[in-house]
Amino acid sequence: MVNRDREKRRGERISTALPVDLGGARGVALDVSASGIFFETDSSYALGNLVSFTVEINAPVGKMLLKCQGDIVRIEPRGTRVGVAVKIIESTMEFASP
């Protein structure tokens, strides 16, 4: 059953390279789903902490901001950077200011 859950989760994720604003730090989203995100950053984070971030999306209608809050569920050292997996618990989307 665990394999089916992992396969289902993988099917829902979208590989990407979107800028992430971490409120004083920057990162790059490498994959996104409706319930989570994985991003790389130079900043350090702790497993279990709450994190707020904004993903910048260039949509056909203009620049959109996906503002999220979530729980850090995994940390992966990646050379000089760190990979952070977040389970999104709250999100809103809005147009960016011109």
Features from the language model and the residues they span:
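N-terminal helix initiation/capping motif
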Residues: 1-32
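Short coil-to-beta-strand transition motifs
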Residues: 21-24, 61-69
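A short macromolecule-binding patch
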Residues: 30, 93-98
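Short, conserved beta-turn/loop elements at beta-strand boundaries and strand-helix junctions
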Residues: 34, 75-80
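Short, solvent-exposed secondary-structure boundary/capping segments
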Residues: 78-89
